[in-house]
């Protein structure tokens, strides 16, 4: 019979579980008391916010339930044992909602607490005074209306970023809202234009909320300091009408001085001051002026204001009128003998004095009458006026000049008859005439031409010298006078009167004379350099008269000196020292023939070949004054006989010159090869080096480093680098020669490793040969030896897996162009007899088969001719002749040296040669 289905099983289990839980619930109801619960029990909500309250009970079947509160509700949700309600627009600082249920004729209650908080959205700092005196206290007051709870609120007063005072309101009632903080602060200078503010912080972090902070708008404080004393006023006591005088008002101890105001006035007239600051000091400067309507005593006032306070100073100032004296002449320009009246007046209250004579009373004019003469011309008249103002005597004066008209006069004092001036310095020519109007003076040469620039500063030149007629003219007449101008100047020696260069001809008659210009006329003398004798009169010219003469001219204005070079010319002449009769030219030196000729002017020299290979050829010369014909270059000069001809404008001369050619040593590859080879044992000879050159060079060769020992025969030690030097009278040449010594081969070493070999073992034969040029290595192995290997240069023979057939005699031969040498070595392969017998039987069969094929190949013509070379004989089946030739032992190397092993008598030795790739 099948069991119950799984679904039925689950249903039964659920039923049992429900019954069990019901029984347990009934038991719990019977055992536990009933209660009501309100969540959240305590809540903190922002003012105007909302909150959900959850009211629940453990009563299994409550009769009814609810939530009592004075707050506004927005929505309700219910269950059997719970109630949820949303409270909105919560504004009361504190309220206590009550959750209740009716259960088993009992009322279950739970009471909650809801408190509100308000952020410090409004932080107000009471306005500050517009100006606050430094050193006095002012009030800082901060209000935060509505923010709370107050117990969580903190207020801070700030000066800029500096904290002045901080206050928290811990312990205030929970329902308390809003706060205020007031402080008295001492005003300082550094507080000027500093911002003050208030910071409010509502800290609800202990209640699970954040920190809410806000600041007031900053308020700027302006502080000031005003001194107790009044400004200092500097001003004149009196001021003339239409004149300007400075007025200065100063006050110290101001702060901030740039914000102070200044008011300056004269009577009802406001002045415009220019204010300058220096720290806490203020200086106001203005210009005071007054009109005629302000004449009298006026009040000058200065007022300085700052921060609503002011300081004031007043001074009295008297405005007066005092015109400049009026000085008049009845005729400012009067002819000689005319009567002129002079008068002076200076206003109604001034007392005037004319030429020291005062007027009778103040306000009246002073007068003077004069019959003028020429002595009154340019006479000045002076009038002085005095006025008393406010106890102070003020003065003004005026002057005027009288001009008297008369005809010109030229006297010797103002226009001398004769002038003598030195040349050069600037002078002013004065020829003045007396007269009024002022005469114009004109000085010119009587015959016309040059005119003197009178009254102007200018240089004195010789062209100004001469006689001039000066005429003075004005409206009253004219005057005439002749004057003479003399210009003196130091001597001058020019090229016309005293040339710098004079040429004389040897044997003629000449004299040295120099003419100098100057005023007064100078004296001239000429002296030869280094001597004291003065040259005077004619003389017979000789070469020793050539040289430099010093000519000096002297007068009262100075002296002048000049060097005169005297050249004595003569015909050409040869001297052996300057132009040798025999000259040797060295090839390649680039040196030219020097043929110096005595003569003036310098002769032109030309040397031309007269016979042989040099006939008609021009010899190149050192002198730049050579002939015009084409000459040889220094590299192809031809020896021979040359005729040298020297010519100048005074004659010519001829000289014979014999030219010979020589050359320095020269070596090259053809005469002295740089690489030479000797054969060891040959007769020792010198290096094959020679050199070209005249005279014939001597060649000497020496070894570099260690010296070469003198031997009869060439040795290997003679190899090395040699330096060959060729020398003659004109120099040296050298070459470096490398000498190589070649020698026949010698097998210096033939060794086996290991010395004895067991069957199946490995062994190696090493062959080392000494030879130059390097030797070719070849091997001869025992017949039947297979599986042989050779190194790349055949110097090593190796066997892997040795057998009895590998035992026997091996020969190593070294061969080069100078001979052949061979050595032999015997290899033994030892082992047990049983191994030998078995191996021998097997090996014998193999050897018989291999031997037949090998014999056929070894006897072949190709092997005899040595035409094959293999890598591995055993693997490839190819074979070569190990002696490399396949002929008789002496076919390439000649007879073997004593002590070496000999080849078989029949001359046919064949073996297998193995070479590696």
From Swiss-Prot:
Expressed on neurons in the most rostral segment of the mammalian brain, the telencephalon. GO terms for cellular component: glutamatergic synapse; plasma membrane; postsynapse. Residues 884-893 have a biased composition (Gly residues). Pfam families: ICAM1_3_5_D2, ICAM_N, Ig_3. One of its GO terms (molecular function) is integrin binding. Keywords: Cell adhesion, Disulfide bond, Glycoprotein, Immunoglobulin domain, Membrane, Phosphoprotein, Repeat, Signal, Transmembrane, Transmembrane helix. Residues 48-130, 135-235, 242-329, 337-402, 408-486, 491-567, 572-651, 665-738, 745-828 form the Ig-like C2-type domain. It is found in: Membrane. It comes from the Eukaryota. Residues 1-31 form the signal peptide. The chain crosses the membrane at residues 834-854. It is a single-pass type I membrane protein. ICAM proteins are ligands for the leukocyte adhesion protein LFA-1 (integrin alpha-L/beta-2). Belongs to the immunoglobulin superfamily. ICAM family. This is Intercellular adhesion molecule 5.
């Amino acid at each position: 019979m099948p069991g119950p289905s799984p679904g039925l099983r689950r249903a039964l289990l659920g039923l049992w579980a429900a019954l069990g839980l019901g029984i347990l619930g009934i038991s719990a109801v019977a055992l536990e008391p009933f209660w009501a619960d309100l969540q959240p029990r305590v809540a903190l909500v922002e003012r105007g916010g909302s909150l959900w309250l959850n009211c629940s009970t453990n009563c299994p079947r409550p009769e009814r339930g609810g939530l009592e509160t004075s707050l506004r509700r927005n929505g309700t949700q219910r269950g059997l044992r719970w109630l949820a309600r949303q409270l909105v627009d919560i504004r009361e600082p504190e309220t206590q909602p009550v959750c209740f249920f009716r259960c088993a004729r009992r009322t279950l209650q739970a009471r909650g607490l809801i408190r509100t908080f308000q952020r410090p959205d409004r932080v107000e700092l009471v306005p500050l005074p517009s100006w606050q005196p430094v050193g006095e206290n002012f009030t800082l007051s901060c209000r935060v209306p509505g923010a709370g709870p107050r117990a969580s609120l903190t207020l801070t007063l700030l000066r800029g970023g500096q904290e002045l005072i901080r206050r928290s309101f811990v312990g205030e009632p929970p329902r308390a809202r809003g706060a205020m903080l007031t402080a008295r602060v001492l005003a300082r200078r550094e507080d000027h234009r500093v911002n003050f503010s208030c910071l409010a912080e509502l800290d609800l972090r202990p209640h699970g909320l954040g920190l809410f902070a806000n600041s007031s708008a900053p308020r700027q404080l302006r502080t000031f300091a005003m001194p107790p004393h009044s400004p200092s006023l500097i001003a004149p006591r009196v001021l003339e009408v239409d004149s300007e005088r400075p007025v200065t008002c100063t006050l110290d101890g101001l702060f901030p001085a740039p914000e102070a105001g200044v008011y300056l006035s004269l009577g009802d007239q406001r002045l415009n001051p220019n204010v300058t600051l220096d720290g806490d000091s203020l200086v106001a400067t203005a210009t005071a002026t007054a009109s005629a309507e302000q004449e009298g005593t006026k009040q000058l006032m200065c007022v300085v204001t700052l921060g609503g306070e002011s300081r004031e100073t007043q001074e009295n100032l008297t405005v007066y009128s005092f015109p400049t004296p009026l000085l008049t002449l009845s005729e400012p320009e009067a002819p000689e003998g005319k009567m002129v009246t002079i008068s002076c007046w200076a206003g109604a209250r001034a007392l005037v004095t004319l030429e020291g004579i005062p007027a009778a009373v103040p306000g009246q004019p002073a007068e003077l009458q004069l019959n003028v003469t020429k002595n009154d011309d340019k006479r000045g008249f002076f009038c002085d006026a005095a006025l008393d103002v406010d106890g102070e005597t003020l003065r003004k004066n005026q002057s005027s000049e009288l001009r008297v008209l008369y005809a010109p006069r030229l006297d010797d004092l103002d226009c001398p008859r004769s002038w003598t001036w030195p040349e050069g310095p600037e002078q002013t020519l004065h020829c003045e005439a007396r007269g009024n109007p002022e005469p114009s003076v004109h000085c010119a040469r009587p015959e016309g031409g040059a005119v003197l620039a009178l009254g102007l500063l200018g240089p004195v030149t010789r062209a100004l010298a001469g006689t001039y007629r000066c005429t003075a003219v004005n409206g009253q007449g004219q005057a005439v006078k002749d004057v003479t101008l003399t210009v003196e100047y130091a001597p001058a020696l020019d090229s016309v009167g005293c040339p710098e260069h004079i040429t004389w001809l040897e044997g003629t008659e000449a004299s040295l004379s120099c003419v100098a210009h100057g005023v007064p006329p100078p004296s001239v003398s000429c002296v030869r350099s280094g001597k004291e004798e003065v040259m005077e009169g004619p003389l017979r010219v000789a070469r020793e008269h050539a040289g430099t003469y010093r000519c000096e001219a002297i007068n009262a204005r100075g002296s002048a000196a000049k060097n005169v070079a005297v050249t004595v010319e003569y015909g050409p002449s040869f001297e052996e020292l300057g132009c040798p009769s025999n000259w040797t030219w060295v090839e390649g030196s680039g040196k030219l023939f020097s043929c110096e000729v005595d003569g003036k002017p310098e002769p032109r020299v030309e040397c031309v070949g007269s016979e042989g290979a040099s006939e008609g050829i021009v010899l190149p010369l050192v002198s730049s004054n050579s002939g015009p014909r084409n000459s040889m270059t220094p590299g192809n000069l031809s020896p021979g006989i040359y005729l040298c001809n020297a010519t100048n404008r005074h004659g010519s001369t001829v000289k014979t010159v014999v030219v010979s050619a020589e050359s320095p040593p020269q070596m090259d590859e053809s005469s002295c090869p740089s690489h030479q080879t000797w054969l060891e044992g040959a007769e020792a000879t010198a290096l094959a080096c020679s050199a070209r050159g005249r005279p014939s060079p001597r060649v000497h060769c020496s070894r570099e480093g260690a010296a070469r020992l003198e031997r009869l025969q060439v040795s290997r030690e003679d190899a090395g680098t040699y330096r060959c030097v060729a020398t003659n009278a004109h120099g040296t040449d050298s070459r470096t020669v490398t000498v190589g010594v070649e020698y026949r081969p010698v097998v210096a070493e033939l060794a086996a490793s290991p010395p004895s070999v067991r069957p199946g073992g490995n062994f190696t034969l090493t062959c080392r040969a000494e030879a130059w040029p390097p030797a070719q290595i070849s091997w001869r192995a025992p017949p039947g030896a297979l599986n042989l290997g050779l190194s790349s240069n055949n110097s090593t023979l190796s066997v892997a897996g040795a057998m009895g057939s590998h035992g026997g005699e091996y020969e190593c031969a070294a061969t080069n162009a100078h001979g052949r040498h061979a050595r032999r070595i015997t290899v033994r392969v030892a082992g047990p007899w049983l191994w030998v017998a078995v191996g021998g039987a097997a090996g014998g069969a193999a050897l018989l088969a291999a031997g037949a094929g090998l014999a056929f190949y070894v006897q072949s013509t190709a092997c005899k001719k040595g035409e094959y070379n293999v890598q591995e004989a055993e693997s490839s089946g190819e074979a070569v002749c190990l002696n490399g030739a396949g002929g008789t032992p002496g076919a390439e190397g000649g007879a073997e040296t004593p002590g070496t092993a000999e080849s078989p008598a029949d001359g046919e030795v064949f073996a297998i040669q193995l070479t590696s790739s």
